[in-house]
Regions:
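Generic structural signal for residues in well-ordered beta-strands
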Residues: 119, 194-195, 325
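Amphipathic alpha-helical
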Residues: 1, 82-96, 103, 290-317, ...
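Active-site-adjacent "gating/activation" loops or surface patches in catalytic cores
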Residues: 112-120, 329-339
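Protease-associated
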Residues: 50, 57-133, 142-146
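Residue patterns forming the tRNA-binding/recognition surfaces of aminoacyl-tRNA synthetases
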Residues: 1-46, 66-68, 102-107, 115, ...
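Conserved phosphate-binding loops in nucleotide/dinucleotide-binding enzymes
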Residues: 136-139, 178, 323-332
Length: 339
């Protein structure tokens, strides 16, 4: 059972939007104009960096009368009737239409922060539910992160490892994300950006061990690049040298290697083989003597076990550089460790 909200993202430049659409003959319209998004995770809105539409869908601007008076709202045409029912709006007029592809680059006002966010295109936007416009928070979802990377969006993660907003987060500092849902909704109401709030029953990921809801948040990790030094190409060539039984195994492995993303080899656990690196406190860059330091760390671990790394005082290896560097506490993916 979750709260679902429809939120206005006001169009920053009305002329820029209307110039991209096809008007209905003899149309008349008035009031503010907003793109409406629908979300079941209000707490992710502080991290919003864009609104995505499907380039292959048709969108409509409708003239409606709401509690805020006359206004114009943009929604995907296949979801128009369902959206109007959800908004409890019976009378409306379609005043303009156009493809989602025409909306790319349009700038919108964030619903409660003083910044503008772009409209971007993403084929993952569907007509299963909502409005056909999806708010994008690259810090809080795999698909959001992927489309955000394509558009070079800022990955702004305002949530700490304890599930609370960071102390410098405007309006929601130190609030737990689930407790912040109510604060976000109140803020949207105060700003006049909340169009509708409903409750829905839907599936949501839970921790298999604790049976509690989980959240998605970006964190710094270590990766092995599939492209640098030609790793993917070399792996594909080596596969050709292997005899497979049955034969179809070769095509399957080739497909897996050809499509796989970079390998995330780091984990945040209290046990496991340590990643013996030191990173600069300010820049995050590796220490310039990293290879030599890894060899020294390996020798210590060979003598004293993996606890030798956890017990190591950085000054023992870095000397005066220790003041500027942090010892990495991540562990290796067990599949990497297995060889």
């Amino acid at each position: 059972d979750s709260l679902a909200i429809d939120v206005r993202f006001p169009v920053a430049n009305l002329e820029a939007l209307l110039a991209r659409l096809h008007y209905v003959e003899d149309h008349t319209s008035q009031g503010s104009l907003a793109v409406v998004i629908w979300t079941t995770t209000p707490w992710t809105l502080p991290a919003n960096q864009a609104v995505a539409v499907n380039p292959g869908l048709d969108y409509a601007v409708v003239q409606v009368d709401t509690d805020h008076g006359q206004e114009r709202l943009l929604v995907a045409k296949p979801l128009l009737k369902d959206s109007l029912v959800r908004w409890q709006i019976e009378c409306y007029r379609v005043i303009a239409c156009g493809p989602g592809s025409a909306l790319e680059g349009l700038m919108l006002h964030h619903p409660f922060y003083d910044r503008e966010v772009p409209v971007i295109l993403d084929d993952h936007v569907t007509t299963e539910a909502g409005t056909g416009a999806v708010h994008i928070a690259p810090a809080h979802g795999q698909e959001d992160y992927a489309v955000g990377s394509r558009y070079d969006l800022k990955v702004d993660n305002p949530v700490g490892p304890d599930g609370r907003f960071l102390p410098d987060t405007p309006l929601f500092a130190s609030l737990h994300v689930f407790a912040a849902n109510g604060r976000v909704i109140d803020t949207l109401k105060a700003q006049g950006m909340l169009l509708r709030i409903t409750r829905i029953n839907h599936s949501y990921p839970h921790c298999w061990r604790h049976k509690t809801p989980v959240i998605f948040r970006t964190t710094p990790q270590w990766f092995i690049s599939m492209e640098q030094h030609g790793l993917r190409a070399r792996a594909l060539e080596e596969i050709k040298k292997v005899r497979f039984t049955p034969d179809w195994g070769e095509a399957r492995l080739q497909d897996m290697v050809a499509k796989r993303p970079d390998w995330c080899i780091s984990r945040q656990r209290y046990w496991g083989v340590p990643i013996t690196l030191f990173t600069h406190k300010q820049t995050g860059e590796l220490h310039p003597d990293t290879l030599e330091l890894m060899e020294q760390a390996a020798q210590r671990i060979e003598r004293g076990g993996i606890d030798a790394w956890w017990e190591l005082d950085p000054i023992e290896l870095l000397g005066t550089d220790a003041a500027d560097y942090v010892k990495v506490k991540d562990t290796l993916d067990v599949w990497f460790d297995s060889g």
